[in-house]
Amino acid sequence: ERMSWEIAKAAIDYILDHEEDMKEESVIWDFIGGEPFLEIDLIDKICDYLKVEMYRRNHHWFNSFRFSFSTNGINYSSEKVQKFIKKNHSHLSIGITIDGTKRKHDLNRIWKAKEMEQGMLPKTEDEKGSYDDVVKNIPLWLEQFPGAGTKVTISSADIPYIKESVLHLYSLGIHEVNINCVFENV
């Protein structure tokens, strides 16, 4: 379910109102789940509100915060996302999730076909993986965030592809690879 502005604002106000309970020197506001950049207008509003409120309250986090994103990278180069990045670059950490080679990535990261939205399995020829749409944004991402890392999601079925995938990512210029293991059947 989509988070509303009202829920986001209430959560921010609650956290900032309880500064005395949160003595950490800095904070990372982490945007995960689904695809956060599909909600770039809401995220931009949230981040602007956070900056203004931390400043207005003279909050000790104002000079020590980051916005962190885990994204599939598909709309990374969009005008709105790039405007947001330019505005907040010095406070951003962005990781693009790419699972390795095209073969490995496209095993699990498939565009939803109309049949899938109706609860039916699509014909094999109608399935399209997202690798090509993600990999085209890797050079821009690495230019903006040199040394950025990626997350690779693996399950037991993916074990034969790990070495090949890590080497492939390295060849794309991604030299930090974090592996998330899926332990349940998906």
Question: Could you tell me what each predicted segment is?
Answer:
Residues 5-8, 12-30, 39-181:
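Radical SAM/AdoMet-radical enzyme domain recognition
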